[in-house]
């Protein structure tokens, strides 16, 4: 399988680094995501769910805990400060897994507009109510449904987070920015998981040294 402009999937060759089993990393390219999202009715709940997951890289529990009050529409910001769990058949909203998970993410203008359109369809939507009142199993079933419908390779909900990162790396985003966006506790965690996706900079270094001769 060809990944972006690479001749082969780098995940197949990478060795285990730290705690991350990086050789099992699965993700969609932007083209695969485009194919997937095209199979979902625009402005529907499912459409917005997967748009938020792909374009922000937030975790499944963070998505399911989102409320309208978490969005700063004037600043195009999304505040991540809670997570959702289903415990003993009860919905539980709790603090995120680590202090670093509490963060603010810049979102693209088109995503903000999609959120506004969705809320507009549900007139009087309470600011503090869960935006997507579903459980994780339902989300997983919907993912499988659209994967089958569109024919894209099957991945997990969490792999959409990996897809977001892979796209950022392809666009040249630095590891520190990705670390902050994902809410990782340190840069090493980010590099252990995604470092193999970064192209080698050795040739660029050699060219720089040549120019300094």
Locate predicted features:
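Proline-centered turn/helix-capping motifs that create local helix->coil transitions or kinks
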Residues: 1-10, 73, 82, 120-125
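N-terminal core-binding DNA-recognition domain of tyrosine site-specific recombinases/integrases
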Residues: 2-8, 22, 133-137, 153-159
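Basic, Lys/Arg- and aromatic-enriched nucleic-acid-binding interface segment
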Residues: 6-66, 73-74, 110
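Conserved tyrosine-mediated DNA breakage-rejoining catalytic core shared by Y-recombinases
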Residues: 16, 32, 65-117
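Exposed loop/turn and edge beta-strand positions of beta-sandwich/beta-sheet ligand-binding modules
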Residues: 22, 46, 74, 101, ...
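Active-site/catalytic core of tyrosine-dependent DNA strand-transfer enzymes
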Residues: 31, 108-153
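DNA/chromatin major-groove-contacting recognition/catalytic segments
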Residues: 35, 41, 89-95, 192-213
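C-terminal catalytic core of tyrosine-transesterase DNA break-rejoin enzymes
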Residues: 51, 55, 61-62, 145-149, ...
């Amino acid at each position: 399988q060809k990944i972006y402009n690479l001749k082969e999937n780098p995940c197949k060759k990478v060795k285990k680094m730290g705690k991350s089993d990086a050789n099992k990393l699965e993700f969609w390219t932007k083209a695969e995501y485009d194919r997937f999202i095209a199979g979902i009715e625009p402005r529907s709940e499912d459409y917005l769910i997967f748009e938020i997951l792909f374009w922000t890289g937030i975790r499944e529990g963070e998505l399911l805990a989102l409320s309208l009050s978490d969005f700063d529409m004037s600043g195009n910001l999304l505040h991540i400060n809670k997570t959702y769990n289903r415990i003993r058949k009860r919905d539980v909203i709790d603090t995120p897994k680590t202090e670093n998970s509490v963060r603010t993410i810049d979102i693209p203008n088109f995503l903000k507009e999609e959120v506004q359109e969705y809320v507009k369809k549900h007139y009087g939507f309470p600011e503090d109510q869960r935006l997507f009142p579903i459980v994780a199993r339902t989300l997983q079933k919907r993912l499988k449904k659209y994967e089958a419908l569109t024919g894209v390779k099957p991945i997990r909900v969490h792999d959409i987070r990996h897809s977001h990162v892979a796209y950022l790396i392809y666009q040249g985003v630095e590891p520190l920015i990705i670390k902050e966006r994902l809410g990782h506790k340190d840069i090493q965690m980010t590099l252990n998981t995604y470092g193999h996706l970064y192209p080698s900079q050795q040739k660029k270094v050699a060219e720089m040294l040549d120019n300094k001769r």
